[in-house]
Amino acid sequence: KTWDLHVKDVFRVPLEENLKMISDTVSYLKSKDKTVFYDAEHFFDGYKSNADYAIKTVFVARDAGADCIIPCDTNGGTITSEFVEIVKEVLAKLDCPVGVHCHNDCDMAVANSVAAVQAGCVQVQGTFNGYGERCGNADLVSVIGNLKLKLGIDCVSGARLKELTETSRFVAEISNVKQRENQPFVGNTAFTHK
């Protein structure tokens, strides 16, 4: 946990013990030759509450050998300008790869994910069609579409880009969730203009 509120009220352990748990867990996984992506759950809420502690948690994970640090906007409530400011501070302080994991409770997940890549993040966690708990996660269809087509960032090959619509529809079908007609990039009404 990266939010001191959760450490105290959910884990019910002292803040230093939580740091030790993070270190021990990452160290154990690295001792087993695992690649470790440390998802810093509730990082943005934690940062807004106690920035020093939230940053300490990711330092501890990095120092224990995490291969990539992933600050998570678990509540999906961080506005893009504030999100980018926090991401830039994390990037300035860490000398390891950084990614992001955004939920979509306030409809900011795609914008925040794209902005994070523009700021220097090297990984985006998301889901096809944005499916996920509550209001969902960053829709990888839109993230990929914007990074590749709007910003020219080579995040997927041209062949993979051509598979977005088919993959999106396949995921909708196996999830038994009707694909939105107006889903950006792949919906039936995308790019239909008068």
Positions of PLM-derived features:
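A mid-to-C-terminal "edge-of-domain" accessory segment
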Residues: L151-K194
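Generic recognition of stable, solvent-exposed alpha-helical segments in well-folded globular domains
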Residues: E85, A138, S142, A159-E166
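Mobile "lid/hinge" segments at catalytic clefts and subdomain interfaces of large enzymes
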Residues: N129-I153, S157, T189-K194
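Alpha/beta enzyme core
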Residues: K1-V98, S113-C121
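Beta-strand segments within the central parallel beta-sheet cores of soluble alpha/beta enzyme folds
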Residues: P71-D73, G99-C102, G126-N129, S157-E166, ...
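Glycine-rich phosphate-binding active-site loops on the catalytic face of alpha/beta enzymes
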Residues: K1-T2, Q118-A138
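Short glycine/serine/threonine-rich phosphate/pyrophosphate-binding segments
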Residues: D105-A111
